[in-house]
Amino acid sequence: LEEKVGPVPIRVDKGPCPLIWLRTPPISEGRTFDRTICAQALGLDSRDLLDITPRLLSAGNPTVFVALKDTDAVDRAWLDSHGCAVLKGGVHEPMCVFVFAPTTCGAYSRMFAPEYGISEDPATGSSTGPLAAFMMRYGLISGAAGTRFVSEQGTKMGRRSILHVHIHGEQGQHGIDVGGNVVPVAEATMKL
């Protein structure tokens, strides 16, 4: 798959409910963000955040990752263009904001991107690889080779998605794969 960040390898696990996997492009780390400002921008109290500094990570789409204490806080979070401006301070490049709470299976997540015209995305594969890197960095999931977990996203907006993550090599040094399956809602043929 040719993306703006370059070629992204894809594989399909065949079967009655096939999973489609993508290999996350190289992840870069950026600046950190103040927890109190992030909480205000998201309409939350700073006590709703885990004691982990929010950080910008990117595998093509710059995204601020904010770890919250529980799924209730994730469901109460909201980010509009005003909140995004508050969070960004003087940063000019557009960015997404990914909030999540660790769960026994991995993470319960939401992604907001008002600067891209997306109030909320139900399934963000391009941010789920960096989510894995963030969670490994702060010990929220194991960084051991072969680690697998899921990120549940889109539930609050009524479009529940399950994204599967597979860590290759210690701390993902050989890659982070993100996969899922789809429910076809339309089909078309294009003649050129």
Predicted regions and their residues:
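Active-site proximal loop and beta-alpha junction motif in alpha/beta enzyme cores
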Residues: 1-192
